From Swiss-Prot:
PANTHER family per record: SNF2/RAD54 HELICASE FAMILY
GO molecular-function terms, A-Z: ATP binding; ATP hydrolysis activity; ATP-dependent chromatin remodeler activity; chromatin binding; DNA binding; helicase activity; nucleosome array spacer activity; ubiquitin binding
Protein name, UniProt field: SWI/SNF-related matrix-associated actin-dependent regulator of chromatin subfamily A containing DEAD/H box 1B
Organism in which the protein naturally occurs: Danio rerio
Disordered as annotated region, ranges: 1-195, 223-273
Superkingdom, taxonomy of origin: Eukaryota
Family affiliation: Belongs to the SNF2/RAD54 helicase family.
Amino acid sequence: MRRKKGPASSSDHEEPPESDSVIPETPETKRPSGSSLSTAISDSDSDSDSEISGSSMMPVRKLRPRKRKAASSADEYSVSDEEEEIVVKTKRRPTHSRTTRSTSQQAQPAHQKASETVTDIAHPSPLKTSGMAAADSVQQRRRQQMCGSSQESDSRKGGRVSAADDSEEEGQRSKDQERMLRKLQRKFPHLNKNELRDVLQEHDWLIDDALETLRMFSDLVVESEDDSSQTSTPAKHTRRVAETRPQAQVTKLSSPPKPKPSRPLDGTRTSQRIAKQPILAKYTYVSSEEECSDSEASVVNGLLDSDSDQSEETLSKLKTEILCFFQSASVDELTLIAGCSLKKAQKITELRPFKTWKDLDDAMRRRNGLSAELLAGCREVLKEREVVKGLMSKCEEISVKLIQDVTQVMDKGPGSMTQPEILSSTFQLKPYQLIGLNWLVLLHQNKLSGILADEMGLGKTIQAISFLAHLYQEGNHGPHLITVPASTLDNWVRELNLWCPSFKVLVYYGSADDRKYMRYEILNQIVEYNIIVSTYNLAIGNSSDRSLFCKLKLEYAVFDEGHLLKNMNSLRYRHLMAINAKYRLLLTGTPLQNNLLELMSLLNFIMPNMFSSSTSQIAKMFSMKSSEEQSSFERDRITHAKLIMKPFILRRVKSEVLKQLPAKEEQVEFCAMSERQQELYSALLHKLKHSSNGEKRELTNVMMQLRKMSNHPLLHRQFYTTEKLKAMSKLMLKEPSHRDADPALIKEDMEVLSDFELHRLCQQYSALHEYQLNTDVLLDSGKLSLLTQLLNSLKEKGDRVVLFSQFTMMLDILEVFLRHHKHRYNRLDGSTPMSDRIGLIDQFNTDQDIFVFLLSTRAGGLGINLTSANVVILHDIDCNPYNDKQAEGRCHRVGQTKTVKVIKLISKDSIEDTMLRIGERKLKLEQEMTATQDGEEDTLPDDMTTLLKASLGL
């Protein structure tokens, strides 16, 4: 009975620092004046403007921890990447030789150093070239680590830790890295997330070093903006550096030599970097409230303060836009400005109207909690809007091109759209599926990826297989990767073999040893294949799995149930993004689930080259919560989203393309809780509402406890009191397996179990048989009472039922209920072995005597065909209504011949009432996105916390 505690997670231990690490960089405040310029700008091997973009724009200085040594150690004097080779060679020399050389270098006149600078730029020494090459090789190795290539590190570890420990350690490390990344995002909101990640990686995820570099980078860009306004020759740049050098290096010969700065001060890299300052400047906007320097604020406010006394007609375009924004923006939009809290936003709305620029400027400087920095922050918001508008323009151009291509196809007549010849002649694509196939072909011809978002049951699997068959017929034999949920793996393999026998399909599935052998065969080209089929969990299961799909050169990566990629900040999203595929195709019946930002995450996944540079702007524009006060820009969000998604998403609903598909009827049954259940629910609600702050649990836990009680009382521990558990723990000593156990520990373990789990424990051990629950207690639930009448009525009509529940323990209780009423059933949940799932589905579809199919909503709601049933009962609804929609689609799909009835069981006057209302509001978002006519956007309060608190009275 007593559960043993497992070993401590390996994630609690960190890898020891590398022995050849570099001395930490000298803090800027302790450096001699004039040296910050040389340490602040990023290094680049090329002067080409085209190469300075994205992450290469950021400083790439690698700072690794080093143990501090005595001041006399020769190792402290040379730490730059270029001089690594010098450090290695001079470690064996006497200390005085290095001191003499260092002193002589410091004594050189400034003009001599300037001439050496020009010489080094034109003719870099072989030693420095090799150092730079070594630095490049280090950077290249680190880039490879992003693809999960950790086989070399695994071999060095030599089996000290198990694969499970590696996974736990990597998971903890990923969480720490995400935490550091979020911290940098808060401090530098104007920088791209991918750029911040690159900076952290280049500094070995040392956040202090990354922060210091980013601060210096931010200060330097402001200087570069000032410098770019003056026309200066390269010679002047060099002379300025040379003139500042004596201040940084003047040292008395009699005093001990000081350690060199962590970067070379010979002027070589400094001159190269200065030439690139204007390029860096154009990527920098206004800094956030936390990190905004005085120089940046003065630059922005200086621009805005000029001509502030003039009339509105003569204001610059920028001032006019800012004035309009502060005059018309909602509170939600005002909070998008860096440093503008909700309180400040409300204050701004109270001070309206702002008829002229002077009115706005005076309001910001009136010591009312506002500041002129908000005007500068407004520029950033306006620039973000411009980025989104530019993205929409690109998408609109693509749409026009695709429409022209579609028109040409339509002009050729319907006969031009035929299914590939290599598809099995036994099957025939439906007209709308042929349209989907041709849409995918057009995307491919334009070198675009896409999202096939047809409603559940319209045959997205078949359309994807047909498209891959078309590529095969055109000479593109792959390889392709199809990533699917575990519950649909067998179905995909079956459909591939049925529809296109020409494909050589490899199923990447099995234990760790099985997959290791398969990786060996794949990488050594021992096995032939066109398509690899795997699951989400195994495709990124461990570093070796991820490394395989980074090394393979895939043509297409197809992701079934693509809405699983809705969170661009998740670890799964990042790992799957690293798969080396030329194109990506997402299949999802529910592209819109909670908000527009999730849709943008899907678009960013399929077209990272187009969307990744605008990720932060898109996140701000589309993650804004709606409110009763809606501005014109906020009302246009759905219109903007439609324009952006139009070229990349094809969505058809059943009512449009399947006129012959039977109707779907939906009804909600409000079930009154049983007398005892109502008492327990009220007591639990009272306890949660009146608990002290120290005892009050998180809202999600409160919600879960109320959900369980509204479904069945036995999901809590109410019947088995503490006195009963004490008696039961003593009886357990009679069992041979627990004779030497401690009754107190047995009782402690029993206290965490629910009533139903304790009931099954009593069934398992003969000593506890007398404590089993009777049938009346097991079936004491309002929903089960209604279900008794409902199933009897459906059985008499000859209907067959698919019964869904969120909780596997509720499925256990439903099994007891079905056996009691003598109903035949099958059951499938997340614990069902993969090898058994397809057999259970086939058995239900062929054996008409099986009345009910029990399914868990998450495991059984994806990609399963159960058209032999015509009634769907949702015993308990999901917080996400689209998961319930997926479950409904198991029956209402191609092949259904009867009217499908969907019945939702809702416990009356419970938490489920609120969940139902939230779900209905979320579904309105999809209706707006798929509407053919524009209309006003309804209020979509997606703040579940507020609604739940209101319903609970908390």
